[in-house]
Amino acid sequence: MGLRGRSTWCEVACSRRNSAIPSDQRLLFGGDRVGSIILAIAAQHEFAAEVPLNPTPIALPVSIVFVALLILALSIRRIRSVGRLPHRKWRRVTEWLVLSLVTLVCAAATLTTTYNMIAQRYYQSIYKAPGKLYEVGGYRMHLYCTGEGSPTLVLEAGWTVPALGWGTVQPELSKTTKVCSYDRAGYGWSEPQPGPRDADQIATQLHALLQQAGVTGPIILMGHSMGGLYIRDYASHYPENLVGLIFVDAITPVQPGQLSPELRADLYEIPTYEYYIFSMTYGLGIPRVMGECSKVYAGFEEHTERMLAESVCNSLLGEIWKEYKGWWQSFDETIHTGPYGNLPILIFSRDPQKHSGAGAPSRLELEESVVWNQMQEDLKKFSTRNRRIIFRGSGHEIPLERADLLNKEVLVFVRQIRNEAPQPTDYGSTKTE
């Protein structure tokens, strides 16, 4: 999810920029409600299959354990010799205290990292993919299709979010038509793939995946946040059999001069050191030890055990980072996409009046809200058959915050494409519901 695009990477961990960042990025920290309930949603709908989650790379945690044990051994050895050193008492005591602290820290790091590795492997081995795996470019990709009927609704999630992020949407929509969600490379049950993670590459891989699975059309694409950028790219390269587009608070390419330097930095520029901090934090198992990987939220108490397998705490941060590094390339690839003639387009947007936090919105947050609202309005230029709906009271996470209204409007959209419902008489409109 991302402009809102900065994904939700920093909303929790970088609270100094908390006001303007969307929820995809919150998923990188296990404490966010969105990330924490993804596996609970999966459990609720009894997802099950034969394929375990991607194994989390062990190079980092193994390295942490090795270094911690080495320092631990050297510290203990030094502690044993401190009392025999010809130093003043205060110096010996100080050195002993410092070495003892180092020993405790290294011992704790070894224990938490080892515990985290074991927990990851255990939960990744017992929770299976809900859908099927298909080979795309020599690597396995996960596609989960439910329901029957035409057209097929293909779901593209936001940044950092696996297919299970559509858990509040897919079960309901699949009662009416065929619905397919999938894991991008390196997410969920899909294997990581070499090469860039920009819009062209992601759209190409999605098209190949659908071809492999025999999902050839007619197709409606629905993309949330950063996923909206990817379905634009797909529509430009593979318009055949495409019968509709649905943008769910979708990101649009940034136009030159559209953002102030301060807002641009706040939304799109993630310092590299933050990635390394996140990697080290997760490698040490700190979120798991603090309970962030097993938080129980109201309404999901019965799924506590399955929530322990939450994909956020087991995510491939390297793949997520690669996708972030491809943002500006993705903007360049999609800035001139469209228009799409009379292709039916539905645009869902968050409430511009909804701001994070209890206090008055900051100047930067107000600026972001104005720019974001205009970007949403600009999506109407893609087709003469467009409608925009602002979800009153909803933030960026529309599929979770207003799943009821989203499902209702999408089902009407599907029936209109089937010619089973009257065609809209308010094309070009923007309304709030």
Regions found by a protein language model. Name each.
Residues 139, 145-189:
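Conserved HGGG/HGGXW glycine-rich cap/lid loop of the alpha/beta-hydrolase fold
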Residues 384-433:
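Catalytic active-site module of serine/aspartate enzymes centered on a nucleophile-bearing elbow/loop
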Residues 11, 16-151, 175-177, 196, ...:
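Alpha/beta-hydrolase fold catalytic core
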Residues 233-237:
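Active-site signature of alpha/beta-hydrolase-fold catalytic machinery across serine-
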Residues 199, 203, 238-242, 246-381, ...:
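Flexible "cap/lid" subdomain of the alpha/beta-hydrolase fold that forms the substrate-access gate
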Residues 144, 184-222, 238:
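Active-site loop/oxyanion-hole signature of alpha/beta-hydrolase fold enzymes
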Residues 223, 227, 231:
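Gly/Ala-rich beta-loop-alpha elbow adjacent to hydrolase catalytic centers
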